[in-house]
């Protein structure tokens, strides 16, 4: 019972965040300096935004950089304010200087909003204490935050990676169960595939997250992570065999009508899903796995495959489920390989600065957007006669996310949560609760808010708002005067952030669809080349298979976000959704062919070359349609035509997959040709060629 409590992801996270915030307050209360303890607890907010609690092989180096930036921004803000430099100019300069961090790496990019939050906190402190005191608070606060988190991760060793792996196993279980519960609905892929696409997307997202964590921890070089690395490779093998399909609905229907295959296949899928959920709990709660066997289920599937040798569905399901059962029984990967190399971009400072100076730099555009929003917020504060509009500025930074959809949701949660929290705080302030009870309530609210923040940001905002009001009450005894202005400030900040995302150099995902589609086709082409090569090696095959899945996942994410964006043609996005559906079929065929190539199921050199040429021509036709902007730009008549495919008796499984890939590619070319007439006619779409949009 205690394992389920202490290792639960939400509980473990909430305990860590609550303790790192509340222990300084408790120490301040004991020594009679409660106000210093409350001020000290502001620093973890900056550290959380900067991601300084991310387990990393350079953990303390990142802490030093973060503390230096926080203290530096605080010092610059105080000195420039003392020289009567306008606040909009100060924030614009800080934003444009620190914006280069986004060119170094995505993790470094989080230092920009965190450093700006530190500068904004300084606004509320300037004039009330010496210049050096905020610097000392940031330096010591970051040191305390780092030491505490280092001790916590040492105490709960491997827990962040275990949480991600546990989520991955659970997602694979849900995906496997959902996939085979729709067995008889495969006749209508448009209805059966979308929910599976969402689950497949979540699984690939979690795989990418595990890759990032392992590379940040250098897990492949650390013996302490050997068991978790093996569990991750097992999950990769399971995902490979779960996310495959023959896409022969007629054959599926025949087999279901002639036998009890549907019940047997579903029995196998449910057994696999149940075992994956048990393994997810074992990983999360630090338990050794128990023995497992599914001989009866596999035996029943083998019997059906032998009774219907003319039907490929039985053999296909038996082959893949037997591999899944082997992984679950032996608790070892199907084959040995190293961890795929880290592809995340990391640049040294000088090359990053060079890229940042280009007007095409996304990092520069993002910094420009934030600087304009900060300036507008500062000017709005001046118009409202607020000398220090720190709450408007903080709201803008807290609700601004990477995309339009995420920002819109965060704005809704933030505004409603703040409203409810201020109402609750306003009512309870009239009760004149003693200080000791107030601190106890703040502790409970902080813990409860962190328990739910990952799943419901709005309700967590309610708790944080009440805590903020009580903090002001304890520091200045004017919490009631804080309520109405802060509500107005929150609404103003949300409006500024929304306007900035819509009108200031927006990066619409709809405009990135064809680039991501082009990248997905390139990944497919490289995978097919490897599969049809003379001597395909297991490790390069595994790496390229994952790149194919990740490229398609990026495309699918872009489509999902584009469907939520304003002002785009719904018919065009609907056609692109169908295009992405066929792209997912190709991914599943590549997953299946990778397993066959690794088992040395190969074609003759001449036949492999002919199939490779056909696939490459079909892919290039799709790329031509994506690349040229004007109708007819790639020629109204297809320049590249697929050669006649060999017709010789019964096709092998590998040939069946290749034939279907070519069919899907031809369909995708037709879809993109029809969808092109309804494409957007503004923004990034004004580029005449796709390569012009790649910067």
Which residue ranges define each predicted feature?
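Alpha-helical membrane-inserting segments
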Residues: 23-31, 47-48, 72-80, 97-102, ...
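Helix-loop-helix transmembrane hairpins and adjacent membrane-interface loops
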Residues: 2-14, 19-132, 146, 150
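Long, hydrophobic alpha-helical segments that serve as membrane-spanning/inserting helices
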Residues: 1-15, 22, 26, 30, ...
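Core alpha-helical transmembrane segments of integral membrane proteins
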Residues: 31-32, 346-444, 466
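Hydrophobic alpha-helical transmembrane segments
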Residues: 11, 15-19, 60-68, 88-93, ...
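Membrane-interface helix caps and helix-loop-helix hairpins in membrane proteins
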Residues: 55-56, 77-84, 103-104, 125-135, ...
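Generic detector of multi-pass transmembrane helix bundles and their immediately adjacent loops
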Residues: 430-571, 577-580
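Structural signature of hydrophobic alpha-helical transmembrane segments
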Residues: 27-42, 76-93, 134-140, 380, ...
């Amino acid at each position: 019972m205690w394992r389920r409590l202490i290792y639960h992801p939400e509980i473990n996270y909430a305990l860590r965040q609550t303790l790192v915030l509340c222990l300084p307050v408790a120490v301040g209360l004991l020594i009679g300096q409660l106000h210093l303890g409350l001020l000290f607890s502001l620093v973890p907010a900056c550290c959380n935004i900067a991601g300084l609690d991310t387990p990393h092989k350079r953990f303390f180096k990142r802490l030093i950089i973060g503390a230096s930036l926080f203290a530096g921004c605080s010092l610059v803000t105080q000195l420039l304010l003392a020289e009567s430099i306008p606040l909009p100019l100060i924030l614009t300069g800080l934003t444009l200087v620190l914006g280069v961090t986004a060119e170094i790496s995505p993790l470094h990019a989080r230092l920009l909003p965190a450093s700006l939050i530190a500068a904004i906190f300084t606004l509320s402190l300037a004039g009330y204490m010496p210049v050096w005191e905020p610097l000392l608070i940031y330096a010591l606060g970051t040191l305390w935050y780092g030491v505490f988190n280092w001790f916590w991760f040492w105490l709960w060793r491997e827990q962040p990676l275990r949480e991600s792996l546990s989520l991955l196993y659970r997602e694979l279980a849900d995906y496997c169960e959902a996939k085979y519960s729709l067995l008889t609905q495969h006749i209508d892929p448009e209805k059966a595939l979308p929910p599976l696409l969402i689950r497949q997307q979540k699984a690939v997202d979690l795989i990418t997250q595990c890759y990032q964590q392992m590379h940040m921890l250098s897990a492949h070089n650390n013996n302490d992570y050997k068991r978790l690395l093996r569990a991750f490779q097992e999950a990769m093998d399971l995902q490979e065999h779960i996310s495959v399909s023959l896409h022969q609905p007629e054959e599926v229907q025949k087999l279901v009508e002639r036998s009890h295959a549907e019940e047997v296949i579903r029995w196998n899928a449910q057994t696999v899903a149940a075992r994956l959920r048990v393994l997810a709990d074992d990983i999360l709660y630090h338990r050794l796995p128990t023995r497992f066997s599914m001989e009866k289920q596999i035996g029943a599937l083998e019997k059906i495959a032998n009774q219907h040798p003319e039907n490929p569905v039985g053999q296909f399901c038996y082959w893949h489920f037997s591999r899944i059962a082997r992984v679950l029984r032996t608790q070892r990967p199907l084959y040995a390989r190293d961890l795929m190399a880290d592809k995340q971009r990391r640049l040294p400072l000088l090359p990053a600065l060079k890229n940042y100076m280009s007007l095409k730099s996304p990092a520069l555009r993002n910094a420009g957007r934030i600087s304009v929003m900060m300036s507008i917020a500062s000017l709005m504060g001046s118009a409202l006669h607020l000398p220090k509009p720190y709450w408007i500025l903080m709201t803008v930074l807290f609700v601004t996310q990477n995309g339009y959809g995420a920002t819109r949701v965060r704005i809704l949660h933030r505004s409603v949560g703040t409203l409810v929290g201020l109402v609750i705080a306003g009512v309870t302030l009239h009760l004149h609760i003693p200080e000791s009870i107030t601190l106890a309530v703040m502790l409970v609210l902080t813990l409860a808010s962190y328990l739910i923040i990952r799943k419901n940001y709005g309700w967590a905002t309610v708790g944080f708002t009440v805590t903020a009001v009580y903090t002001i009450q304890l520091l200045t005894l004017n919490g009631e005067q804080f309520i109405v202005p802060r509500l107005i400030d929150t609404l103003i900040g949300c409006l500024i952030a929304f306007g900035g995302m819509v009108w200031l150099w927006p990066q619409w995902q709809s405009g990135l669809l064809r680039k991501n589609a082009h990248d997905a086709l390139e990944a497919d082409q490289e995978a097919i080349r490897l599969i049809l090569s003379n001597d395909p090696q297991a490790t390069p095959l595994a790496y390229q298979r994952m790149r194919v899945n990740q490229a398609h996942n990026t495309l699918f994410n872009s489509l999902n976000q584009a469907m939520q964006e304003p002002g785009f043609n719904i018919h065009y996005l609907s056609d692109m959704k169908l295009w992405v559906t066929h792209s997912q079929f190709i991914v599943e065929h590549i997953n299946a062919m990778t397993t066959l190539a690794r088992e040395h199921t190969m074609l003759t050199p001449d036949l492999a070359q002919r199939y490779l040429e056909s696939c490459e021509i079909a892919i290039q036709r799709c790329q031509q349609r994506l690349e040229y902007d004007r109708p007819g730009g790639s020629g109204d008549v297809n320049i590249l035509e697929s050669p006649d495919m060999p017709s010789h008796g019964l096709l092998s499984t590998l040939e069946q997959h290749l034939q279907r890939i070519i069919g899907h590619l031809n369909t995708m070319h037709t879809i993109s040709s029809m969808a092109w007439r309804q494409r957007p006619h503004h923004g990034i779409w004004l580029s005449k060629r796709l390569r012009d949009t790649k910067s």
